[in-house]
Design a protein with these regions (language model features):
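Short, surface-exposed loop or secondary-structure junction motifs
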Residues: 1-203
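Short, well-ordered beta-strand elements
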Residues: 219-220, 225-235
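Short, small/polar residue-rich loop motifs at catalytic or cofactor-binding pockets
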Residues: 213-215
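Generic C-terminus detector
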Residues: 234-254
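Short, hydrophobic/aromatic-rich segments at coil-to-beta transitions
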Residues: 203-209
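Short acidic, gly/pro-rich beta-turn/loop elements at beta-sheet edges
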Residues: 173, 201, 231, 240-241
Length: 254
């Protein structure tokens, strides 16, 4: 991925990125094992091929508009651009070997070539969205209830259950991504999901799920306690355990 600049080249549209990715060999045969990868970008490309509609338009129609997520998308408007927060850390994910932590120094980090701010062609399945804490919170609440904040049912309870269920066999546990362990967690269609409290390192609940972003954004949903949480930062490769600290603080108040 790094040598071919699959992630780093934001000038490619989704079709071009998948074409470049398709030139690389598979890490293993399908069903042999599980690997955190760019599979969701491949899925976005397949969705475009099947529907004949771009993934950004589908997200807008089925998620962003119904949830009133007015500040979420791949391309910022001229009105939104001045509100974009500065990114800090290291320029490329390749430079931080995705989950190897770097010295926590506030250096401004120009990521525009990787995440174009105003390119109408840029779109991905797994990275690259701009959003606000308000919008991200609306999305987290939707994953908790299946409804918009106005009460509109957007997804069936059966589908919610299918999305939340752990998909990893015991042979793929404990969950580890690029050398970083996630004790107690499996993986569902929405990110990591707590399956074994006895192995967990944070005071959470069975079925709690969520995931993080490259610049340390983070969300979690706890169906048991009916709560959600969102953290928004702009630091690539932070070495501070912010996610764990916030989970500990949140659950300490319950």
């Amino acid at each position: 991925y790094r040598e071919a600049e699959i992630l780093a080249d934001g000038a490619r549209d989704l079709n071009e990125m998948i074409s470049a990715l398709a030139q690389l060999p598979l890490a293993f045969h399908p069903k042999e094992r599980w690997l955190y990868s760019m599979s969701i970008d491949v899925l976005a490309h397949l969705v475009e091929c099947v529907t004949g509609t771009r993934i950004d338009a589908l997200l807008q129609e089925y998620i962003f508009d119904p949830l009133d997520m007015r500040d979420t998308g791949f391309c910022l408007s001229n009105a939104q651009l001045p509100r974009l927060m500065t990114n800090y850390g290291r320029y490329k994910l390749e430079a931080i070997a995705p989950l190897n932590k770097i010295e926590h120094v506030l250096e401004e980090n120009n990521v525009a070539s990787m995440y174009p701010e105003q390119s109408s062609e840029y779109r991905r399945g797994g990275i690259g969205l701009y959003a606000t804490a308000q919008d991200y919170s609306a999305f987290a609440r939707f994953l908790l209830t299946g409804k918009s904040d106005t009460g509109e049912k957007l997804i069936s309870n059966n589908m919610i259950g299918l999305m939340r269920a752990n998909r990893l066999p015991l042979s793929a546990l404990p969950l580890s991504i690029s050398g970083q362990a996630f004790p107690g967690y499996g993986w569902n269609l929405l990110g990591r999901v707590m399956t074994d409290l006895g192995q967990g390192a944070v005071p959470t609940a069975l079925g709690e799920f969520g995931w993080s972003g490259a610049a340390q954004s983070y969300f979690w949903v706890d169906p048991q306690r009916q709560i959600t949480g969102v953290i928004m930062t702009q630091f690539m490769g932070s070495n501070h355990p912010l996610h764990e600290d916030m989970l500990n603080a949140a659950y300490a108040t319950l």
